[in-house]
Design a protein with these regions (language model features):
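Cytosolic-facing regulatory segments adjacent to core modules
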Residues: 79-87, 91, 96-132
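C-terminal boundary of histidine-terminating zinc-finger modules
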Residues: 225-236
């Protein structure tokens, strides 16, 4: 059964970097194959994984809706669209990537998200893990594109605003009655130990930080050198923190299975 791990959080909190380091962990532990999904219109996950995207869900849909495109004789519209969508999957040895891209028009992402969700449901059964990097904010939750997940990673930077966003996300999960089996709180880009104001803010929400990922100059260095984050060394502080998070998540899943 495919295990789905999805990111949520405000912009600028490092969700893409975190998704990349989660994939790095899975690759290092041979937890493959992996389907990576970039559901952010401002797509960057491919770069972090060292992959090249030629087509996105958005571009496939735009082409498909072009009146000039003809459907081959004997093929239904649905079958042809599915064929074109499969062409948007970037394949590599152990991790494949699907990128949503932009919608049909400015600010229009609803149809691509609906198609993405249905397509992912069919595609995901072929993978051990699905790791989804979502767009900033709460839109993907309100549109229910992150509806059924095993592990929802709620990411905040070391800021009071970020903690408030955590509260908004937790409220929305309850309001929409989303099928989120477990949620983890991650404070990313921490300059040191958590500030008492951050700790107090989390306590007010009735949660704590499941992981604190320190600021890591290596991530900025790799960005400048245009190197995939999956190639970061084991000595990277961020890698160590994410590895610890994943060990905790997978240990909890094993314990849950043993309890039946």
């Amino acid at each position: 059964m495919t295990i789905t791990i999805a990111m949520a959080g405000k912009g600028g909190t490092g969700k893409t970097s975190l998704a990349s380091l989660i994939i790095r962990y899975l690759l290092r532990h041979n937890a493959v194959p992996i389907l990576a999904v970039d559901a952010d219109a401002n797509a960057n996950l491919a770069w972090s994984l060292g992959l090249t995207v030629k087509q996105t869900i958005g571009s496939v849909l735009a082409d498909f809706n072009d009146v000039k495109m003809g459907i081959p004789p004997g093929m239904t519209k649905e079958a042809y669209l599915n064929l074109k969508l499969n062409g948007a999957v970037v394949e590599s040895k152990n991790v494949d990537l699907l990128t949503m891209g932009r919608g049909e028009g400015a600010g229009c992402y609803c149809f691509p998200n609906n198609v993405l969700k249905e397509f992912i449901d069919k595609l995901a059964v072929n993978y051990r893990f699905l790791v989804m990097d979502n767009e900033a904010g709460l839109e993907h939750l309100s549109r229910r594109t992150t509806e059924n997940v095993d592990e929802l990673i709620i990411v905040s930077n070391h800021s009071v605003k970020g903690v408030r966003t955590i509260g908004n996300i937790l409220d929305l999960i309850k309001e929409l009655k989303l099928n989120v089996k477990r949620q983890s709180i991650v404070i990313n880009q921490a300059p040191g130990p958590l500030d008492p104001m951050i700790v107090a803010g989390l306590e007010e929400l009735g949660v704590g930080a499941d992981a604190v990922i320190p600021m890591d100059s290596l991530i900025a260095d790799y960005d400048l050198q245009q190197k995939p984050l999956t190639e970061l060394p084991d000595t990277s502080p961020a890698v160590r923190a994410v590895d610890g998070l994943m060990e905790k998540l997978l240990a909890t899943r094993r314990a849950d299975r043993e309890r039946g």
